[in-house]
């Protein structure tokens, strides 16, 4: 009730609330895509790579929730702002001096993450930890060896201070919400079995296709595997893959309520950052294609086709996604072995590459949206209170 769209709506009592909620949701999706492009471009990625990953963001199936369960995705622009603030913190610190002090930009970014969706803040908090861990080694290279341990401790303490400020500023929301949850425990059915908690997710719907996960396509999983091979991105890529694959992390990040991959949506920006690393490396010939890794990506797709996906249109698109990846990986391996170089500066080659990368994600996004059965104004099945109850109270 303290979100910006809700507060602004109080100033316009004659405008229906649906316009504010829908307009703000669309604005946040577009803002997130723009911020992701800006973040990647600022980190030195090419226009091609930044645009492609920005489009991956906009076409991620998790944004299906922007009209249904808005708290699943409405914090993402502020998480991207937090990553931008972390970049600035590491860029502008003097190499011989580091003072522990609050970073206003990071505090405000995390504050709005909590304000929009406190349930997903533990995942946002962990995503920032992974990003800091990724940035630290490069930062410490410019710090004298005798000061590196002290500098590392100061950076982590500074992050804890910033998070503490953000949480404290949200206590007006967190305290009553926490007391309400404790005072009104909801029966969620049978408790989650230990076998399920300690299991794995062979479908990888935490990253692939599902609107209750990140909802990305197969190239992003392939890029994740390629980044595991590279020393610079290996630790971050392994950490992200472990979170995506092992059910116990779903359970922990869902506050031990259930084992569902929706808690991993906050890692979408990090996955796209790794996708940008892989795509840029492939275009610059710094990373080589791998047909075995492409074949490894086929396993979760086949499992999903057998057990999860029943819509024929989606099955065809997912199959096309797999075939396209295998063809591109095979062609890439062939060109590398023959030492044939494709000029990436040609506009028509870049255009063709964008079409190959973005066609399947956009079609999957539109097809997934067509599965929704939208509630009509006359449908009162979701109303907790009937119209008569509301009239009696008012």
Task: Give names to the regions the model predicted.
Residues 1-33, 55-77, 181-186, 194-210:
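Membrane-interface coil-to-helix junctions
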Residues 1-4, 154-265, 307-317, 383:
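Periplasmic/ER-lumenal interhelical loops and adjacent helix-loop junctions
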Residues 22-28, 72-75, 123-124, 206-215, ...:
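Alpha-helical transmembrane segments of polytopic membrane proteins
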Residues 29-43, 47-93, 98-137, 158-178, ...:
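Membrane-embedded helix bundles of polyisoprenyl
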Residues 32-40, 78-90, 126-134, 220-224, ...:
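Transmembrane alpha-helical segments
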Residues 94-98, 138-155, 340-343:
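Membrane-interfacial, low-structure loops and terminal tails that flank and connect transmembrane helices
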Residues 236-245, 252-387:
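Contiguous transmembrane helix-bundle modules in multi-pass membrane proteins
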Residues 390-394:
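Short periplasmic/luminal acceptor-recognition loop of GT-C membrane glycosyltransferases, typified by
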